Amino acid sequence: MINYLWFVLAAFCEIAGCYAFYLWLRLGKSALWVLPGLLSLSLFALLLTRVEASYAGRAYAAYGGIYVAASLFWLAFVERSRPLWSDWLGVALCVLGASIVLFGPRLSQ
C-alpha cells in the first residue's frame, strides 16, 4: 500500500519540477524557477526509488498511470483548466494499462 503513496508523491514532484521549467521557458518567468524545479525533480527521483519492485521498468510502467492521473489533477487545480471527457477517458485507459502491469500474473520472478 505504501507504494501508492510513493507513486503519488513522486508524480506531483515530477509535475511540479517540469512545471517550474515550463514557467521559465514557455511563460517567461524568472530563471530562478529552475532551482525549485531541480529540487522537485531530484525529490521525484528519490521518491520513485522507494517503491518496492523486483524490476525498475515494471515500477516505472505502473507509475505511468498514476502520473497521467496526477497530471489531470494538476491541470484542474493548479492551472485551473477543466479536463475534457477525452482527458478522463485517456486517464482511465492509462490506469487500466498500469493496473495490468501491476497486478498481472507473473510467470517467473
Curated annotation (Swiss-Prot):
GO cellular component terms attached to this protein's record: plasma membrane
Protein name: UPF0060 membrane protein PSPA7_1846
Residue ranges of the TM segments: 5-25, 27-47, 59-79, 84-104
Subcellular location field: Cell inner membrane
SUPFAM superfamilies: Multidrug resistance efflux transporter EmrE
Annotated source species: Pseudomonas paraeruginosa (strain DSM 24068 / PA7) (Pseudomonas aeruginosa (strain PA7))
Family indicated by similarity: Belongs to the UPF0060 family.
Entry keywords, A to Z: Cell inner membrane, Cell membrane, Membrane, Transmembrane, Transmembrane helix
Organism lineage: Bacteria, Pseudomonadati, Pseudomonadota, Gammaproteobacteria, Pseudomonadales
Pfam families per UniProt: UPF0060
Keyword Hydrolase: no
Record's bilayer topology term: Multi-pass membrane protein
Record has Cell membrane as a keyword: yes
